[in-house]
């Protein structure tokens, strides 16, 4: 029974990619828990799930700067799976990257992303490798922001159903202050993932910033639209901190007083979040409450 619970917990963390948001202490705890579990000999662990968990262990070790241990995990998987799957390709590029060889990682991936690979491989393989290449170029400052955006937009033309590409494009447009284009990209994300509460929150935030620099009539229209998206985000996730903060801020920007139902409700929800949520959300909620 205990092994069943641990297995399901670890697989859930892997499938949701929750570990990518863990702090150093949580990563260390996860690493130790995984190593103990993997040595426990769980007969109910399928081969496929074994590889999934080993993949997560690899990235946990990378995040913790355990380069040697990460290499050992990679070697274990390579001996079992070979080097040709896109996940192994991305792992190899990651190892090159963390060992300070960004140029080698870029050349390795670019050599794979030739015309033959584009047309001979499946969608997941090509787009996954292409996204990894862009990520390395971005962190290594190999490309300007405009060049990165050009590559991402080119990929959205080829793979319009990849929500992550549209999200990445929206983030770049947002940083460049091109809020209208950022909103368009976020709307594409919602067409693909219609229950993505975080995306509704980000769209609301982007519309809010666009409204702040717009003329009065347009500003009100944009704020109303931003409020609608913020409300949708908290409809999908009742204790979504960012969503309730936006509901409060946008309602105030629209000129509503403290007795307004939405302002009272959002303040109440922020208090609930400060009492119930994780430490990070608690602190953030309390800071917001102090300002309102």
Curated annotation (Swiss-Prot):
- The UniProt entry annotates TPR repeats at 163-196
Which biological process annotations from GO are given for this protein? phospholipid metabolic process; phospholipid transport; protein folding in endoplasmic reticulum; protein insertion into ER membrane by stop-transfer membrane-anchor sequence
Q: Which GO terms describe its cellular component?
A: EMC complex; endoplasmic reticulum; nucleus
Which parts form a coiled-coil structure per UniProt?
A: none
The membrane topology noted for this protein in its Swiss-Prot or TrEMBL record is: Peripheral membrane protein
Q: Does the keyword Endoplasmic reticulum apply?
A: yes
Top-rank taxon of the source lineage equals Eukaryota
Subcellular localization is given as: Endoplasmic reticulum membrane
State whether it acts alone or in a complex, and with which partners, per the record.
Answer: Component of the ER membrane protein complex (EMC), which is composed of EMC1, EMC2, EMC3, EMC4, EMC5 and EMC6.
What does the further note read? Present with 5740 molecules/cell in log phase SD medium.
Family membership: Belongs to the EMC2 family.
The role this protein plays is: Part of the endoplasmic reticulum membrane protein complex (EMC) that enables the energy-independent insertion into endoplasmic reticulum membranes of newly synthesized membrane proteins. Preferentially accommodates proteins with transmembrane domains that are weakly hydrophobic or contain destabilizing features such as charged and aromatic residues. Involved in the cotranslational insertion of multi-pass membrane proteins in which stop-transfer membrane-anchor sequences become ER membrane spanning helices.
Protein name, please?
A: ER membrane protein complex subunit 2
Encoding gene per record: EMC2
């Amino acid at each position: 029974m205990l092994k069943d619970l641990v297995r399901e917990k670890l697989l859930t963390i892997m499938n949701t990619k929750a570990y990518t948001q863990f702090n150093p202490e949580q990563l260390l705890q996860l690493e130790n828990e995984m190593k103990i579990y993997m040595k426990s000999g769980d007969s109910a662990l399928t081969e496929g799930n074994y590889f999934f968990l080993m993949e997560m262990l690899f990235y946990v070790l990378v995040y913790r700067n355990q380069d040697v241990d990460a290499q050992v995990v990679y070697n274990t998987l390579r001996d079992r799976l070979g080097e040709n799957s896109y996940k192994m390709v991305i792992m190899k590029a990651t190892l090159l990257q963390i060992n300070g060889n960004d140029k080698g990682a870029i050349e390795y991936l670019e050599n794979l992303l030739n015309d033959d690979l584009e047309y001979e491989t499946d969608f997941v393989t090509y787009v996954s490798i292409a996204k990894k290449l862009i990520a390395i170029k971005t962190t290594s400052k190999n490309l300007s922001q405009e060049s990165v955006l050009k590559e991402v937009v080119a990929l959205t033309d080829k793979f319009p159903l990849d929500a992550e590409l549209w999200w990445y494009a929206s983030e770049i447009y947002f940083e460049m202050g091109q809020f209208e284009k950022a909103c368009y990209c976020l709307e594409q994300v919602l067409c693909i993932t219609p229950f993505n509460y975080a995306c509704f929150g980000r769209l609301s935030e982007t519309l809010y910033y666009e409204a702040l620099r717009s003329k009065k009539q347009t500003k009100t229209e944009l704020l109303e639209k931003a409020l609608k998206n913020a409300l949708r985000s908290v409809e999908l996730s009742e204790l979504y901190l960012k969503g309730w903060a936006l509901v409060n801020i946008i309602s105030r920007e629209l000129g509503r007083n403290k007795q307004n139902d939405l302002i009272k409700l959002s303040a109440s929800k922020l208090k609930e979040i400060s009492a119930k949520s994780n430490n990070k959300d608690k602190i953030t909620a309390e800071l917001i409450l102090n300002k309102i």
